[in-house]
């Protein structure tokens, strides 16, 4: 797979708490130049990006990020504001405590509630695999499928681990046919980019892809 094809699968990501407007502009410009699938950025920058770049960029943002603890009502409010500001894609974090309490139906209902708000736009569900057992991961595959979300996503990039090949294989076995996979966290080499796409990931969340494919040494998410 050539570099251009790889980058069409990349959500060019900048979610560091110290991200400046100059940092954000850099990834916006790179997204336009290299035709990435989207940029994934903090919600506070959505309006400014939309005002500056218009429809040249597909904007993704995060909700309930990175811990997932906020209430469903809070996540709905975040989502509504993000969409009003110009986001086209929402990456939400589930309440991991609900998973640990085996309140799987509650997680499903929260995802469903956000999908109702998102409508025809894209909802990706971050399940933070590094904290879950295999049983819990399978339960979340079912929850994401039943709730009608568009993607299941491995990680925030702020947890104790990121995407693994084993988790991608597990997802493929247990998600429904309409659910796609996004790998994020630890996608740090060109080999990783190719491996996850070849394994069936439709999206990759990383800040490193453009630099890696340009042959640069990079650090980040």
UniProtKB/Swiss-Prot annotation:
Record's keyword terms, sorted: Cytoplasm, Lyase, Schiff base
Enzyme class: lyase
GO function terms (MF aspect): deoxyribose-phosphate aldolase activity
One of the GO biological process terms: carbohydrate catabolic process
Record CDD domains: DeoC
Keyword match Cell membrane: no
Record's subcellular location: Cytoplasm
Pathway assigned in UniProt: Carbohydrate degradation; 2-deoxy-D-ribose 1-phosphate degradation; D-glyceraldehyde 3-phosphate and acetaldehyde from 2-deoxy-alpha-D-ribose 1-phosphate: step 2/2
Reactions mediated catalytically: 2-deoxy-D-ribose 5-phosphate = D-glyceraldehyde 3-phosphate + acetaldehyde
Gene3D superfamilies: Aldolase class I
Positions annotated as active site in the UniProt record: 91 (proton donor/acceptor), 153 (schiff-base intermediate with acetaldehyde), 182 (proton donor/acceptor)
Chief localization: cytoplasm
Family: Belongs to the DeoC/FbaB aldolase family. DeoC type 1 subfamily.
Summary of the function given for this chain in its UniProt record: Catalyzes a reversible aldol reaction between acetaldehyde and D-glyceraldehyde 3-phosphate to generate 2-deoxy-D-ribose 5-phosphate.
Name by which UniProt lists this protein: Deoxyribose-phosphate aldolase
């Amino acid at each position: 797979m050539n570099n251009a094809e790889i980058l069409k699968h990349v959500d060019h990501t900048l979610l560091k708490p110290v991200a400046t407007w100059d940092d954000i502009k850099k990834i916006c410009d790179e997204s336009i130049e290299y035709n990435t699938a989207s940029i994934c950025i903090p919600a506070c920058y959505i309006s400014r990006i939309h005002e500056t770049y218009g429809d040249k960029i597909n904007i993704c943002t995060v909700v309930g990020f990175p811990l997932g603890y906020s209430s469903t009502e809070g996540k709905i409010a975040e989502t509504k504001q993000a969409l009003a500001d110009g986001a086209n894609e929402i990456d939400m974090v589930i309440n991991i405590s609900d998973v640990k309490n085996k309140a799987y139906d509650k997680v499903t209902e929260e995802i469903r509630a956000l999908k109702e708000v998102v409508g025809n736009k894209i909802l990706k569900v971050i399940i933070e695999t590094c904290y879950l057992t295999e049983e819990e991961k399978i339960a979340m595959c079912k929850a994401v499928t039943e709730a009608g979300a568009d993607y299941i996503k491995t990680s925030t990039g702020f947890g104790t681990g990121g995407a693994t090949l084993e988790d991608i294989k597990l997802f493929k076995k247990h998600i429904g046919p309409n659910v796609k996979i996004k790998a994020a966290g630890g996608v740090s080499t060109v080999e990783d980019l190719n491996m996850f796409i070849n394994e069936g990931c439709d999206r990759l969340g990383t800040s490193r892809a453009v630099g890696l494919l340009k042959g640069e040494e990079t650090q980040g998410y």
